């Protein structure tokens, strides 16, 4: 009889590659290695920005070892069968995962697990297509949308356009500088390529975009106002918009400085300017977001590209909150070697475009 674990082997083989750079805690793990352990669950923390559980196992020397296993956001895992009750202390499980780079740390990044009753739970990377083509076309850009997972390509594009100052900042980056460890949301336009549900509302005087991984809505003013002089800098910046036919044009300025505001480790400055054009595809099943990203302090030239979102009227936003203690947990035991590995991963990204 073929077990669920046997069915996962091909996928596990595929996943034995470097972990995505966008994952705020990829630094501690060796994405080229895959290990398997069996043991007993001692703790399960179903919290954001990453789910953790702990497994007590016996090593080759016969000693008892407790492993810390990290997975994805609760919003992602909830869509592939996970709940806050998926694991209980005392459950016997088998875990397939990427181990920590630091051999002294019993720490893993989950690929999949199997419970004694045959239940298999996987990471987000092994999910099926979560937004099959809808039966109806979108009437306009308003509605619920699921972005393609395109942020790794965005990282590669920005790395190529970084000027001398941007490259120097990229090379000097250390993981303790990562704003994600302080629950700071992902910056624009990176978040446009994160695979989390977005809802667009079109009102008389504004457009409201709600991303399920942020507590703050993005407001685009449509009443003809300009950007305020000496306005307050903020994470989302100040956005104004207008219609050109069926195309929503959005201009955003007054961004607060962000250590990763222009890519994986490229900062952004108050000079950052983002222009977006939202329009439906010919099939009316996808939303195209063309954008121009400018920041002369860190870029040699503007980045011109696009993201695509899939129409997903059957999906809804899952409430999100970020737990600061959980957000910082991955920093424990991070070694200097991990930072060196990050630099090598960035170099590969720039040279080959292989950014995950």
What do the PLM-derived regions correspond to, one by one?
Residues 1-9:
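Bacterial N-terminal signal peptides that target proteins for export
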Residues 13-14, 31:
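Short, linear, compositionally biased motifs with a strong N-terminal bias
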Residues 20-24:
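Boundary at the C-terminal end of the N-terminal hydrophobic targeting segment
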Residues 27-356:
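PEST-like low-complexity, intrinsically disordered acidic/proline/serine-rich tracts
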């Amino acid at each position: 009889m073929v077990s669920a674990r046997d069915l996962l082997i091909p996928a596990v083989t595929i996943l034995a590659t470097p972990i995505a750079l966008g994952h705020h805690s990829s630094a501690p793990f060796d994405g080229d290695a895959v290990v398997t352990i069996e043991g007993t669950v001692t703790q399960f923390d179903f919290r954001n920005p990453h789910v953790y559980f702990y497994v007590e196992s016996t090593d080759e020397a016969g000693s008892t070892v407790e492993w810390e296993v990290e997975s994805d956001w609760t919003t992602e895992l909830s869509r592939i069968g996970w709940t806050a009750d998926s694991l209980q202390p005392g459950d016997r499980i088998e875990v397939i995962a990427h181990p920590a780079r630091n051999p002294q740390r019993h720490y893993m990044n989950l690929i999949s697990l199997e419970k004694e009753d045959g239940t298999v739970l996987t990471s987000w990377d092994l999910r099926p297509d979560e937004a099959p083509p809808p039966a109806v076309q979108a009437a306009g850009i308003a509605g619920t949308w699921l972005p393609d997972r395109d942020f790794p390509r965005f990282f590669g594009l920005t790395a190529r356009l970084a000027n001398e100052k941007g490259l120097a900042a990229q090379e000097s980056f250390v993981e303790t500088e990562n704003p994600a460890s302080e629950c700071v949301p992902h910056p624009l336009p990176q978040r446009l390529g994160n695979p989390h549900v977005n809802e667009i509302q079109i009102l008389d005087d504004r457009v409201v975009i709600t991303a399920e991984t942020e507590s703050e809505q993005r407001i685009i003013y449509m009443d003809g106002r300009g950007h305020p002089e000496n306005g307050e800098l903020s994470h989302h910046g100040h956005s104004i918009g207008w219609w050109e036919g069926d195309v929503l044009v959005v201009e955003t300025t007054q961004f607060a400085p962000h250590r990763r505001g222009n890519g994986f480790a490229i900062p952004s400055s108050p000079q950052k300017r983002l222009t977006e054009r939202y329009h439906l595809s010919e099939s009316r099943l996808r939303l195209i977001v063309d954008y121009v990203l400018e920041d002369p302090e860190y870029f040699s030239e503007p980045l011109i590209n696009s993201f695509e979102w899939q129409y997903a009227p059957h999906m809804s936003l899952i409430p999100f909150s970020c737990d600061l203690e959980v957000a910082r947990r991955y920093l424990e035991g991070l070694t200097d070697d991990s930072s060196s590995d990050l630099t090598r991963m960035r170099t590969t990204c720039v040279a080959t475009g292989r950014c995950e």
